[in-house]
Amino acid sequence: MKSEEFDVIIVGGGPIGSIASLLLSKKGLSVCLIEKNASPYPFPRGIALNGFTMGVIEELLGEKWPDFDYTTAIEVGYVLGKDRMNEPFGKMQPPVIDGEILDLDHYGFINWFNQPQLERLLRAKIEDDGGIEALYGHEALVLWEDEKNYITIQNNSTGDTKTLSSDYLIGADGGGS
C-alpha cells in the first residue's frame, strides 16, 4: 500500500464506487477504493443506465468504450404498483415531443447492460489510472470520525487489518448493505 492517508476513501467497487474513484482521481485527489470481492461478482444487480450515465461511462472508458456491450430500449416494460404487483398500471416510455422521441444524449431513453462486464472494464481503467489505490478482496470493518475519517479494513485472504484515514468517505457498497 502506497499510503494510509487519502483525500477520499470509497467503500464499494461496483459501478458507482469505481466511477466515483475515476472521476475524483481525474480531479487530482488521492483515492483509495475498497471492495470486498477480489474479482467482479458474476451476477448482475443493476441492469439499466440512463443517457447521462452512459455519457460519463463513455468518457471514462475511453478506448475501452467499444468493448462495453449495451442495448438501448425504445420502450421499457411496465411499472407495477405495490397494491397490484401482478397487474401493470402504466408503461414507462421515453419522452415524446411533437411526435418524436426526445433523445438529447444519443444513448436512448434507457440502456440495458451487463454489470459484471462493466465492472471488469472499470477495474481495467482503475489499474491504468495509477492514482487510485484499489484494495480488492478487502472489507470495511469499522469506521469512525475524529479530526479525519478513519476506517479499519481487513484483507479477506490473510485476515490482516489496517487503519486508513481520509478527508471524505463515500459509501458505495450496494443497495442491500
Residue ranges and their predicted role:
Residues 3-33:
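N-terminal Rossmann-like FAD-binding beta1-loop-alpha1 element of flavoenzymes
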Residues 4-6, 158-168:
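Core beta-strand elements of the Rossmann-like FAD/NAD(P) dinucleotide-binding domain
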Residues 10, 21, 57, 119-122, ...:
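Conserved structural-core and active-site-/substrate-pathway-adjacent residues in large, well-folded domains
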Residues 27, 128-130:
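Conserved dinucleotide-binding and phosphotransfer motif residues
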Residues 45, 49-127:
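Active-site-adjacent segment of FAD-dependent monooxygenases/related oxidoreductases
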Residues 136-150:
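A conserved short coil-to-beta-strand element within the FAD-binding core of flavoproteins
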Residues 171-177:
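Flavin (primarily FAD) binding-site architecture
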